[in-house]
């Protein structure tokens, strides 16, 4: 059985002077690319789960304001749809405001253990409130109090006052009402790139771009 399935270290093939991954990461889609990149995304995430990647859905999401000034942060992919990936935030946060001004965004999944990357590009669309209600109730209830009292990205003037307000809400049994600004965005993908650490620095890069006729794929030089 391939060592990557068992999560055992495999030195040699995937080693690089600049990358520290030690788990063999199969990339069968590079030789026979499927027509739909979302199936590749599902496959990679499932393999990452099997080999024990610590945070496989931690997406470094880059947004930009109306003047093109970028900002980045980590969000968690909560769901994969047929057209993109979903994550939750607060509408009044910096990313929420920027996505309202400029919906184009780019995200990267980087898995150090296997030296793999997935680059996701597209436009963010705010989902209906019903989706936000669903996402809110899926969160651990212990996260509700602070998420309810916080006005994400606004200046924090009194740490203890905010802590006390959250502790007061924590006395409530069960879920709290969803805060008005809590929302879900879908990053509807226009392109994806799957990157694998290859032999002799011939890294394996498989890119998909959406077109009027559907998805088109091509291999890129390292």
Swiss-Prot record:
FMN binds at residues 73-76, 88-89, 94-95, 117, 152-153, 205. Keywords: Antibiotic biosynthesis, Flavoprotein, FMN, Oxidoreductase, Virulence. Pfam families: PNP_phzG_C, PNPOx_N. Substrate binds at residues 18, 90, 139, 147. One of its GO terms (molecular function) is FMN binding. Binds 1 FMN per subunit. Its cofactor is FMN. It comes from the Bacteria. GO terms for biological process: phenazine biosynthetic process; pyridoxine biosynthetic process. InterPro entries: Phenazine_biosynth_oxidase (IPR053451), Pyridox_Oxase (IPR000659), Pyridox_Oxase_CS (IPR019740), Pyridox_Oxase_N (IPR011576), Pyridoxamine_oxidase_dimer_C (IPR019576), Split_barrel_FMN-bd (IPR012349). Its EC number is 1.10.3.16. It is an enzyme of class 1 (oxidoreductase). Pathway: Antibiotic biosynthesis; phenazine biosynthesis. It catalyses: (1R,6R)-1,4,5,5a,6,9-hexahydrophenazine-1,6-dicarboxylate + O2 = (1R,10aS)-1,4,10,10a-tetrahydrophenazine-1,6-dicarboxylate + H2O2; (1R,10aS)-1,4,10,10a-tetrahydrophenazine-1,6-dicarboxylate + O2 = (5aS)-5,5a-dihydrophenazine-1,6-dicarboxylate + H2O2; (1R,10aS)-1,4,10,10a-tetrahydrophenazine-1-carboxylate + O2 = (10aS)-10,10a-dihydrophenazine-1-carboxylate + H2O2; (1R)-1,4,5,10-tetrahydrophenazine-1-carboxylate + O2 = (10aS)-10,10a-dihydrophenazine-1-carboxylate + H2O2. PROSITE patterns: PYRIDOX_OXIDASE (PS01064). SUPFAM superfamilies: FMN-binding split barrel. Involved in the biosynthesis of the antibiotic phenazine, a nitrogen-containing heterocyclic molecule having important roles in virulence, competition and biological control. Catalyzes several oxidations in the terminal steps of core phenazine biosynthesis. It oxidizes both hexahydrophenazine-1,6-dicarboxylic acid (HHPDC) and tetrahydrophenazine-1-carboxylic acid (THPCA) and thereby contributes to the generation of both phenazine-1,6-dicarboxylic acid (PDC) and phenazine-1-carboxylic acid (PCA). Belongs to the pyridoxamine 5'-phosphate oxidase family. This is Dihydrophenazinedicarboxylate synthase. It comes from Pseudomonas chlororaphis (Pseudomonas aureofaciens). The lineage of its organism: Bacteria, Pseudomonadati, Pseudomonadota, Gammaproteobacteria, Pseudomonadales. The gene is phzD.
